[in-house]
Regions:
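Active-site proximal beta-strand in glycosyltransferases
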Residues: 3, 101-103, 116-136, 147
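N-terminal strand-loop element at the rim of the active site
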Residues: 6-13, 26, 30-77, 177, ...
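A conserved mid-protein helix/loop that constitutes part of the nucleotide-sugar donor-binding site
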Residues: 14-22, 204, 208-227, 246, ...
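Glycosyltransferase donor-sugar binding loop
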Residues: 37-45, 209, 236-248
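Donor nucleotide-sugar binding/catalytic pocket of nucleotide-sugar-dependent glycosyltransferases
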Residues: 147-196
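Aromatic "clamp/platform" in nucleotide-sugar-dependent glycosyltransferases that forms part
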Residues: 266, 285
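Short hydrophobic beta-strand element within catalytic cores of glycosyltransferases
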Residues: 302-306
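Conserved acidic donor-binding segment of nucleotide-sugar-dependent glycosyltransferases
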Residues: 317-319, 323-330, 338-344, 359
C-alpha cells in the first residue's frame, strides 16, 4: 500500500507536527506500507522531529509561512502565486508516484486535492475544530464583513470536504459540529509514549504546557494563579512551551506571582516534568484535541481544564479522573486548582483514575483504527 502524507512543515515544535511525525514513524516501523511525505516550507532547514529513513519525502519549498508577515494586499497576491505553483507541483507528484491513499491535513491543498486524477483515495484529517478553523477576524474591518468572509470560506471548505472519501476529526465533540458531512469519522490523537512511572502527586507544583500564544490562554491561567497564590503561597506553577514568553513574564510580575510562576522554554524531557508535578492545568481558549492533557494524565497527574472546544470533554470525566470548568471562567479554574491542592487524597485518586482512562489513547489502539480505515479504503478501490 502506497500512502502520501501532506505534512507542510516540521520546522517548529507544535502539536500537529508532533502527532503527524509520530504517526508516520509508527507506520514505517510496524507496517510494510510505502510511505511518502510532502513538505512545503524552507527546504534545507533542520526539522524539529526525526522521521524514519524508510519514509520518502519531497519539499516543494513553497514557503507559505512567508505570507504571515505581509500586509493583506501583498498576502493575497503572493498567496495566489504560491498556491498556483503548489497545485502544479502537488499534481505532478501524485501523478508520478500514483499513491493508493493521500492524506491531507486540510490545509491549502484541500482546495484542489479532489481534482487530481491520480486514482488515490483522498482522506482529510483536521487538527483544529470547526469553531476556530478558517475564521476571518480583522479588527480594522467591520464585523459584518469578517462574518461574510468566514461564511464564504466555510462554504468553500464544505464543498471540498464532502468530496473526500473520509474526513477524520479528533473528538466526538467536533464530530457534532459537521452535520453537513456524511463521510466523517472520529479517530483521536494517540499518546506515542506511555511512561512506566507515575507522579506521587505530593509535590507542591502545578504544570502547564503549550506554545506561548493567545490560544493557550496562559494570560487566563496567570490571573487564576493569583487567586490560588492568595490561598496557597507555598505552591508554584511551571509553564513550558515554545514561542515568545516575555509578555507572560511581564504579566506575572504585574499580578504579583512571578516569585512562584516560571515560564520555561520547551524541553525534551517533558514527561519528567509531569512526574515532578501534582496538578496539570489546561487553560486553552480552544483546542484541536488537547493531547498534552492526555499525556500528563498518563503519568498519573490529575488535570484541571477549561471545557473549551474541542477535546477536553472527550478526555476528562469530570470529578472522576480530572476537573472540567466553564471555558474562560478564571474563578472556576482557580477553584478547581484549589480543590485539588486542599484535598490530597482526592488529588491522588483522580491521578490514579487518569492513568487508567487515557489508556484508550495508546498508540497501538489508535493506529489500529487508522489501519482499519486504510484497509477499508483499499477494499473500496478493489470493488470500484
Amino acid at each position: 500500500m502506497k500512502i502520501v502524507y501532506v505534512v507542510g512543515g516540521l520546522l517548529a515544535p507544535n502539536g500537529m507536527s508532533s502527532v503527524l511525525s509520530a504517526k508516520i514513524n509508527y507506520l514505517a516501523e510496524h507496517t510494510d506500507y510505502e510511505l511518502y511525505m510532502i513538505l512545503t516550507e524552507k527546504s534545507g532547514h533542520p526539522w524539529c522531529y526525526q522521521i524514519n529513513p524508510k519514509v520518502k519525502w519531497v519539499n516543494f519549498d513553497i514557503n507559505f509561512d512567508e505570507l504571515d508577515t505581509m500586509p493583506l494586499y501583498r498576502k493575497i497576491f503572493f498567496y495566489m502565486l504560491k498556491q498556483r505553483r503548489y497545485k502544479k507541483m502537488f499534481t505532478d507528484y501524485l501523478m508520478e508516484i500514483r499513491p493508493d491513499i493521500t492524506v491531507s491535513t486540510v490545509r491549502r491543498e484541500i482546495n484542489f486535492i479532489n481534482d487530481i486524477p491520480d486514482g488515490s483515495k483522498k482522506i482529510g484529517e483536521i487538527h483544529f475544530n470547526r469553531t476556530n478553523y478558517r475564521e476571518f477576524k480583522k479588527k480594522w474591518l467591520p464585523d459584518f464583513f469578517n462574518r461574510f468572509v468566514t461564511k464564504l470560506w466555510i462554504h468553500s471548505l464544505l464543498k471540498q470536504l464532502k468530496r473526500l472519501d473520509r474526513f477524520v476529526v479528533l473528538s466526538e465533540e467536533d464530530y457534532k459540529n459537521w452535520p453537513e458531512l456524511n463521510n466523517k469519522i472520529v479517530i483521536p490523537n494517540s499518546i506515542s509514549y506511555y511512561p512506566d512511572f507515575q507522579s506521587t502527586c505530593e509535590n507542591k507544583r502545578a504544570i502547564a504546557v503549550g506554545r506561548y500564544t493567545y490560544q493557550k490562554g496562559f494570560d487566563l491561567l496567570l490571573q487564576a494563579w493569583r487567586i490560588v497564590f492568595e490561598k496557597h503561597p507555598d505552591w508554584r506553577l511551571d509553564i513550558y512551551g515554545s514561542g515568545e514568553r516575555e509578555e507572560y513574564e511581564r504579566l506575572g510580575k504585574e499580578l504579583g506571582v512571578s516569585e512562584v510562576v516560571t515560564c520555561h522554554p520547551a524541553v525534551s524531557d517533558i514527561y519528567e516534568k509531569y512526574r515532578e508535578s501534582s496538578i496539570f492545568v489546561l487553560s486553552s481558549r480552544y483546542e484541536g484535541f488537547g493531547l498534552v492533557l492526555a499525556e500528563a494524565m498518563s503519568t498519573g497527574v490529575p488535570a484541571v481544564s477549561f471545557a473549551c472546544p474541542c477535546g477536553p470533554s472527550d478526555i476528562i470525566h469530570d470529578g472522576i479522573d480530572g476537573i472540567l470548568v466553564e471555558n474562560g471562567n478564571i474563578q472556576a479554574l482557580a477553584d478547581g486548582i484549589c480543590l485539588l491542592i486542599e484535598n490530597e487524597t482526592f488529588r491522588k485518586r483522580l491521578g490514579e483514575e487518569a492513568t487508567k482512562s487515557v489508556s484508550c489513547f495508546s498508540q497501538d489502539l489508535i493506529m489500529n483504527q487508522w489501519g482499519n480505515l486504510f484497509n477499508l479504503m483499499m477494499k473500496k478501490n478493489t470493488l470500484s
